[in-house]
Amino acid sequence: MRKSKKNIVLFLVSLLAVSLVPQKVEAKHFDFLNDIKFPVDNIKSHFYDDWKEKRGGGSRLHLGLDVRAPKGAKIIAVADGKVNTVAFTESSGYYIAIDHMNGWMSLYVHLNDDIVGNDNAGDKTVAFAKDFKKGDVVKKGEVIGFVGNSGNAEGTVPHLHFELKYLGVSQDIYNYIAKAWNNYEKLKLFPKNTKSLLIN
């Protein structure tokens, strides 16, 4: 009887331990990551691995990837999906959230809020693509907005804070964005070789 109780306790403890382990992306869903497009359509874009860098004086971790690009550069949907949010907050500025297949969501943050000669004088018309709204169905590569530095990014260089979440949890996507950039760069620099490059 004691042995039986001990086994039950061990079983319950092991179940609890498993439930506390952070959820990892299932292997079958890596197909989505391997097929995403680079989120900014501008050859002058650049980025580095800033996942979990300390921000706000060390008060928070950076759970995304910042892509620097010229102000007003086109932001594109990295995959097919449906627009979940088109909004403005004091911290994020103008931002977009798009739902994708199998529990994925992409976030595009700090979109443009400036017009020529007048910082912060712009509105959603300089942040989002024309007539872009919640509920829209978007295709991979479709222009959805424009690079800027709205929200708490005011005063920084123009950039897109890009994030991918799986079942609500932000993921470290640097390697996949680097791969998407390499494909984008090749297609821009060597357009005649487009077909062969798409195979790789």
Regions found by a protein language model. Give the residues of each.
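N-terminal secretory signal peptides that target proteins for export/translocation
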Residues: 1-3
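Sec-dependent N-terminal signal peptides of Gram-positive bacterial secreted proteins and lipoproteins
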Residues: 5-23
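Surface-exposed, glycine-biased beta-strand/turn segments
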Residues: 20-95, 114, 139-140, 149, ...
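A generic structural motif
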Residues: 68, 99-101, 165
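Zn2+-dependent peptidoglycan hydrolase active-site motif and core
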Residues: 78-130, 157-159
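Acidic, glycine-anchored pre-beta loop/turn
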Residues: 129-138
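Glycine-rich acetyl-CoA-binding "A-motif" of GNAT/NAT acetyltransferases
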Residues: 143
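Active-site loop architecture of trypsin-fold serine endopeptidases
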Residues: 147-161
